[in-house]
Design a protein with these regions (language model features):
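Glycine-rich phosphate-binding loop and adjoining beta1-alpha1-beta2 segment
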Residues: 63-103
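Short His-Asn-centered micro-motif
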Residues: 36-40, 61-63, 110-111, 129-132, ...
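A structured beta-alpha segment of the ubiquitous adenosine-cofactor-binding alpha/beta core
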Residues: 90-126, 131-138
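E1/E1-like adenylate-forming module used to activate ubiquitin-like modifiers
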Residues: 123-175
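Glycine-rich adenosine-cofactor-binding loop
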Residues: 22-65
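Glycine/serine-rich phosphate-binding loop and adjoining beta1-alpha1 elements at the start
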Residues: 1-32
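Conserved beta-strand segments of alpha/beta enzyme cores
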Residues: 57, 105-107, 150
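Short amphipathic alpha-helical segments
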Residues: 47-48, 72-73, 139-142
Length: 175
């Protein structure tokens, strides 16, 4: 079993990795800098998983307020008392409050990522795009490709009014 170092990014010992014998994998993550754009249903689950890895930094970006419908689309269960007490809290602040208990490298950004500020993400190891606005996703995708940023687009961005156009057909990011 590997001994935990003082530079551990977790706020308490990661006994899961040693139990599974995968400490060697953790070394591959130690210098990674991850950005998660959007903390809706998909983005919050990405954060839930990434926060349990020893990546150096996790930056979360979202300018939306955590609302009742988000409680049904996020990991865990939010109490009705907490929903009422934290009414109007930003998504990034809500999730930071939870996941910073475990991971010391989380930074919350209460803003949208746009073409005007996307260059701030040029030095990230990986960027997860998990937003529901197709035009913004398309623009960010093009920007990341142009900057050479490694990204994963995981949002679906399907609205009921669009279903007739999308039903039984393939969607392409090509112009």
């Amino acid at each position: 079993m590997e001994v935990m170092s003082d530079k551990n990014i977790f706020n308490y010992p990661d006994t899961n990795s040693s139990r599974a014998g995968i400490e060697f994998l953790n070394r591959k993550f130690e210098k990674q800098k991850i950005a998660i754009i959007g903390l809706g249903g998909t983005g919050s689950y990405i954060l839930d998983q990434v926060a349990k890895t020893p990546v150096k930094e996790i930056h979360i970006f979202d300018a939306d307020v955590f609302q009742l419908h988000n409680a049904f689309r996020s990991p865990g269960a939010v109490s009705s008392e907490k929903l009422e007490a934290e009414n109007g809290i930003m998504k990034v602040d809500y999730y930071y409050g939870i996941y910073s208990n475990m991971h010391a490298g989380i930074t919350a950004h209460s803003k949208y990522v746009t073409l005007e500020n996307v260059s701030e993400l040029k030095d990230f190891s990986y960027v997860f795009i998990s937003i529901d606005k197709n035009e913004v996703r398309y623009n960010l995708t093009k920007a990341f490709l142009n900057m050479g940023v490694t990204f994963i687009d995981v949002g679906i961005g399907v609205n009921k009014s669009e279903l007739s156009e999308w039903c039984c057909s393939c969607y392409s990011w090509n112009d």
